[in-house]
């Protein structure tokens, strides 16, 4: 899966941040059902997004907001509009960063099957030299509408990331591999390979943000390897 996920932070008058992050994905070799059985296709997936109000306290960065998805109509689209609550807690440390990101997606429109999925992403990354990090950031999901053989997806994996600046543009590059140790019986990929490009884009709707600017902890939260 290749993912482009820009982050657009709005700096508020109180010094906190409103962060919008759409995610555009291209999925390779996704198994889908067809008249002749299952086949693998490579197409654009639905557009997921999160909108978080972010603040810092006692060395933590927190966020609360919503997540959702917009259907693209592709062969692997859910054909649903999704929306639900989310929460973020990030702890930067001397050795790296760790935290968790629980969220829930519920069908609010569309022609696809009913959707009610709760997810928890936990992440733990160790900082190396020159902006490099290594760690893990899998997302565990529970499908409330599935039967007992298909409700849980539990992956484990490893990711390597690099945070750098291209001119004045801060970007995070991330590559990861995951193995589903628990997966739906119907059909699910055993392995997942991900390449992600995440720039922090200067917000065109806020060319002159109020002081203070985005602080280091919030910037770490924006660039954290969350979904």
Residue ranges and their predicted role:
Residues 1-109, 113-227:
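Transmembrane beta-barrel domains of Gram-negative outer membranes and organellar outer membranes
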């Amino acid at each position: 899966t290749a993912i482009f996920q820009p982050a657009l932070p709005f700096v508020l008058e109180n010094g906190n941040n409103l962060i919008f992050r759409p995610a555009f994905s291209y999925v390779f070799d996704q198994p889908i059902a067809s008249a002749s059985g299952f086949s693998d296709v490579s197409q654009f997936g639905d557009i997921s997004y999160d909108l978080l109000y972010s603040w810092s306290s006692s060395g933590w960065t927190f966020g609360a907001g919503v997540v959702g998805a917009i259907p693209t109509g592709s062969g692997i689209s859910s054909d649903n509009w999704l929306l639900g609550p989310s929460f973020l807690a990030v702890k930067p440390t001397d050795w790296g960063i760790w935290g968790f990101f629980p969220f829930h997606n519920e069908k609010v429109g569309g022609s696809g099957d009913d959707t009610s999925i709760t997810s928890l992403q936990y992440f733990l990354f160790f900082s190396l030299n020159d902006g490099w990090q290594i760690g893990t950031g899998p997302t565990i999901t529970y499908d409330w509408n599935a039967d007992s053989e298909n409700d849980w997806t539990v992956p484990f994996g490893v990711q390597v990331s690099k945070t750098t600046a291209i001119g004045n543009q801060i970007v995070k590059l991330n590559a990861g591999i995951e193995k589903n140790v628990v997966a739906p019986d119907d059909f699910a990929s055993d392995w997942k390979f991900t390449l992600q490009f995440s720039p922090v884009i200067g917000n065109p709707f806020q060319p002159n943000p109020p002081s203070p600017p985005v602080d280091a902890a919030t910037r770490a939260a924006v660039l954290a390897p969350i979904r």
